[in-house]
Structure formats: C-alpha cells, structure tokens
C-alpha cells in the first residue's frame, strides 16, 4: 500500500501538514478551492525561475496569507520589496478581488539539495538540455548525499535517451521506508519536455523519523529511544519453611 499511495497524503496529520489551511461552508468551498488552484498556477508560471518548492495558503476572515518556500528569495522580493507588491497585485487580479488583503511571507529553503521538488526540477532542466539521464541521476544522487539525506529514490519514465520504446528506470540510495508512517518523506513530481516527448520524473527523499510526542526528527545515524523494559519481580518460595 505504501508504494502505491501518495506519500504526503498517507502521512497527513502525522508528519505532513495541509498545504491549504482554511474552513468554508459547502457553498463557498468550491470557490476557495478554485482560488487556491489559480494562485498556485499563477505563481508557478510567473516565478518558474525562482525555484519555488511549495506554496502554503491560509485564510483568516477576509485576509489571505501566503508562504512561499524558495531557493532564490531575491528573485521574488526584488529591489526594496518591489517584487512583493507586484506579486500581491498579480494575485488580487488572478482571484478577481482588488480589495482582498494579501500577506506574503518568503522563506528561503535551507538545504536546496535535500528538497524533493528542487531535485526534480534540477533533473528536468538537465534532461531538457539533452544530458544523459543516467549521468543526471548520478549527479542528483551526489548532491543529495552531500546535503545529508538518509535516503533518496529517483524514477524517470518515457523515451529515455530518445529510445523508440518508452521505459521506466529508477535508482535508490539509502533507506526510503514508504510503509513507515512516522518517516518524514518529501515527494515531488515533474515533467521534462524533450524533443522525443515528455519524460516523467518522481523523487522521494527520506529525511528521518519524526516522534509523535516530541515532534523531533531523529538525527542521522541515531536510533529512536525505546522505553526500558520493566524487569519482572522475583519472589522466593518459602512455602516449606514452617513444615
């Protein structure tokens, strides 16, 4: 089951959080859902070169809050914050409400080579430049290992290297426990448009195990602490002392 279901959807509420946080009635829910889709599509098209790995959306009354996780925050912010104002006006135009309050928070991704989306984006860019897919995967594995990930799995499918028959190939380094719910697994998919057709890319990144109570990720090489087993009490047999 863990190999077929979406890794993030399986772990919602355990190690993963929802990308959209808001509540709506049955009448307004479809409208807000379409707004979220339009906002993410607009940001992906306009700021494709900024390396945005995720867009988190939260709503409070009439206020819209966005959190953008990016590898290059300077591309979005611009000079003296001019890019933020341009992005805000673009979002208001996209949703068709110029009076909507939009708060934007740009967060820089600390470990770029440990992010599944950015790794998939890197692989897609290399494949579109006609770099051999085996060499591209090997370079992505090396970058992820230098970033300190515990495990990585990469899958590429399509007409690899221009072959007439499409096929799927994958490689894995380290551990990628898809059945372990407490495992923090980052998952992303991308498409590479080549002259021979579209190549599909899937990336799984295992970053560690999250303890539910402590909400801490277990560091590299460490094992989760187990409760010490209680030793059984020993009783002496004194039934024959008074006989």
Swiss-Prot record:
Recorded hits in InterPro entries, A to Z, give: KH_dom, KH_dom-like_a/b, KH_dom_type_2, KH_sf_prok-type, Ribosomal_S3_C_sf, Ribosomal_uS3_bac-typ, Ribosomal_uS3_C, Ribosomal_uS3_CS
Q: Which domain of life is it from?
A: Bacteria
The record's annotation in SUPFAM superfamilies points to:
Prokaryotic type KH domain (KH-domain type II), Ribosomal protein S3 C-terminal domain
Record's keyword terms, sorted: Ribonucleoprotein, Ribosomal protein, RNA-binding, rRNA-binding
Q: Spans of biased composition, class Basic and acidic residues?
A: 233-243
Query: Per its UniProt record, what SMART domains does this chain match?
Result: KH
KH type-2 domain location, by residue? 39-110
PROSITE patterns (UniProt xref):
KH_TYPE_2, RIBOSOMAL_S3
Name the CDD domains for this protein. Answer: KH-II_30S_S3
Segments of this protein annotated with the region Disordered? 216-243
**GO BP of this protein:** translation
List GO molecular-function terms, semicolon-separated. Answer: mRNA binding; rRNA binding; structural constituent of ribosome
- List GO terms (cellular component aspect): cytosolic small ribosomal subunit
Q: Which family is this protein grouped under?
A: Belongs to the universal ribosomal protein uS3 family.
Give the function comment from the record.
Binds the lower part of the 30S subunit head. Binds mRNA in the 70S ribosome, positioning it for translation.
Q: How does it assemble?
A: Part of the 30S ribosomal subunit. Forms a tight complex with proteins S10 and S14.
| Name recorded for this polypeptide | Small ribosomal subunit protein uS3
Please tell me the species this chain comes from. Answer: Prochlorococcus marinus (strain MIT 9215)
In the UniProt record, the gene name given for this protein reads rpsC
